[in-house]
Amino acid sequence: VADVARYKAETGKPVFDAAREAAVLDKNAARITDETLRPYYRAFLSDAMAVSRAYQRARLGRDTAAYQGVPGAWSQIALQRLFPFARQTACTTWGEVFDAVQSGDAQFGVLPFENSNAGDVSTVLDLLYTHPDIIISRMCDLPIRQDLLAVPGATLQTIRTVVSHPQALAQSSVFVQQHGFKTSTWGNTADAARHVAELNDPSVAAIASAETAGLYGLQILSAGINADGDNTTRFIVIERAAAAPAMTGEGQRLALLFTARHKPGQLAAALDQIGARGFNMECIKSRPLPHVPFEYYFYVQLVCPADSSGAACQALLDTLTSVCSTLRLLGAFTLDGTEK
């Protein structure tokens, strides 16, 4: 891998060549005759390539990744696991993460997209819609465990107020209500923990990660207070793309943004085409169109059917283009977990 990084440095070639990697995946996956094993082998190769790219960028000094919050935030934890060799840039807002990627100050941005308990992060979806040069290059699931943190010496009996991000408060609402705590919203879970540490008040606690407790010298009063034991947040990696994402088919997910004509049956016609071509629609979301009252855009996430190809994906897009008012391929990627 070091030789590959050196060659790319000498020739000026990019670390990531989507078309080249897609061709390598296609060629090697075709050697697996067992159709059941083929997608697993393809996913293994894709993960190995991702690790190789991270190492190459570290050698070349090209990797900078942005996140929203402060050290200890869940976005920073996800970033650390996805890009362990990257330089990290902390941003105040999700919009600033997009700006950093758009301007080239960061090659990647890591953002929360959806939580299995609290639902969508709609602001991030809206930012994706309003940044046409940004794509989703990767998606991963991170198990979330919310802990109640306080200064040393505090107990559950001394706590009166709990501060945290609204989603963390929502995920832990049963625990909070059972103890009769007042709540105060904060912009970020890790920053809430830092605030509690600075207050040094045994009546105030934060809901945040165990990693945050270690960073800010807090104790864990109660671990795993989120109501859903399987609480998981889905994070996306965004990049600025010079070209459309490379579609390879089997083993991939496609993320699409589109608008439908404001006529009866137009949305149904688009969804019918997706099903008719064998693509499984994992989710559909609607959001208000900016500056167009009471009209909406749609986000759909599709699983490519087994044995499908890039050509099959393109055929679907061509068909949808004739049905939809606007259509944008937001991403073509694999879904993985940050904990294996």
Where are these regions (language model features)?
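Domain-level signature for soluble enzymes in the chorismate/prephenate branch of the shikimate pathway
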Residues: 1-340
